[in-house]
Regions:
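Conserved active-site tyrosine of GNAT-family acetyltransferases
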Residues: 20-25, 82, 113, 158, ...
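N-terminal beta-strand motif that seeds the catalytic metal site of vicinal oxygen chelate
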Residues: 1-18, 62-67, 123-156, 186, ...
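Short, structured motif recognition centered on aromatic/hydrophobic residues
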Residues: 6-10, 30, 43, 52-54, ...
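Conserved donor-binding loop and adjoining core beta-sheet/short helix segment
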Residues: 35-37, 45-70, 93-95
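Core segments of cupin and vicinal oxygen chelate
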Residues: 2, 8-50, 150-187, 192
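Vicinal oxygen chelate
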Residues: 6-15, 57-141, 144-153, 178-179, 224-288, ...
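Short, charged/polar, Gly/Pro-enriched secondary-structure boundary elements
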Residues: 48-53, 113-116, 186-190, 250-251
């Protein structure tokens, strides 16, 4: 059975691409590749040529999710698994592969209608090292970009799809959330059963240093970026993080220090709470 190996890239549809470029570089510490002739902005965080593709759609939500597989045979096997499960699959065109800068990809909607791409052969730029404008380093490599958390209306059906068709493994549960891993990162995907106006609840990027999280936290507190949840430590992945609002209205989690999964010893559990401590919403402005 073929299985995805990492969260390779995320596509976001936004209404203000210039504001996103400022936020991504000056706050998150990602590197901009600039805005291309199609009006799309791509962002780096490691040796991959891009991890985020920002498109000026006005949607202010998730545009697509890109999951990586090892090679072309794995991609073809995955396409077969999807079709066998009743999912309509199309191959990426030459122009689409060129746009994503991959050797090959397939496209489909997951059971909740999330536009999803599975690809192989991303371009790696060791000759052009990632250079963060804020001197931030990120935990990626075999762990991929980070994670995304998606709102779904039917949790059981969607869990079965990502586990039984895409080959992900359940890490644990918290209330109405299911967490999945496809490499040592505790979760590359989480699903929350909830009716919400946006498909994307948040995405997460993990820094190599707690100092980077702390410095960014100070920047948010001292500036005009909305803080949605203060510093805290999660029960399941043990990450120390905080949440802030992006220019599109969904959140980004900025964290450090998550534990990893060893499948030879890992056991699925259900946590009673989401955080060991912290992650509290900010004090209401009226209390100031």
């Amino acid at each position: 059975m073929a299985a995805v190996t990492q969260l390779g890239y995320v596509g976001l549809g936004v209404s203000n691409i210039e504001e996103w470029e400022h936020f991504a570089t000056d706050v998150l510490g990602l590197a901009s590749n600039g805005i291309d002739t199609d009006g799309n902005l791509s962002l780096r965080m490691d040796e991959y040529s891009h991890r985020f593709i920002i498109q000026p759609t006005g949607k202010d939500d998730l545009q697509f999710v890109g999951w990586q597989v090892t090679d072309e045979p794995a991609l073809r096997e995955m396409a077969g698994q999807l079709r066998d499960s009743g999912i309509e699959v199309t191959d990426g065109t030459d122009d689409e592969n060129k746009s994503r800068r991959v050797e090959g990809m397939i496209k489909f909607d997951d059971p909740e209608g999330t536009p999803t791409e599975i690809f192989y052969g991303p371009p790696i730029s060791f000759d052009r090292p990632f250079n963060s404008p804020r001197a931030v380093g990120f935990v990626t490599s075999e762990q991929g970009l980070g994670h995304v958390v998606l709102h779904v209306e039917n949790l059981d059906r969607t869990v079965e799809f990502y586990r039984d068709v895409l080959g992900m493994k359940i890490s644990d549960f918290i209330r109405n959330l299911a967490f999945f891993h496809c490499n040592p990162r505790h979760h590359s995907l989480a699903l929350i059963e909830s009716k919400a106006p946006k498909k994307l609840n948040h995405f997460m990027i993990q820094t190599e240093s707690m100092n980077d999280v702390g410095a960014t936290y100070d920047m948010v507190l001292d500036g005009d970026i909305p803080l949605t949840r203060g510093l805290g430590r999660h029960t399941n992945d043990h990450m120390t993080s905080f949440y802030m609002k992006t220019p599109s209205g969904f959140d980004v989690e900025y964290g450090w220090g998550a534990r990893t999964v060893d499948d030879s010893t890992w056991q699925v559990v259900r946590h009673e709470k989401g955080s060991i401590w912290g992650h509290r919403p900010p004090v209401a402005a009226a209390a100031k």
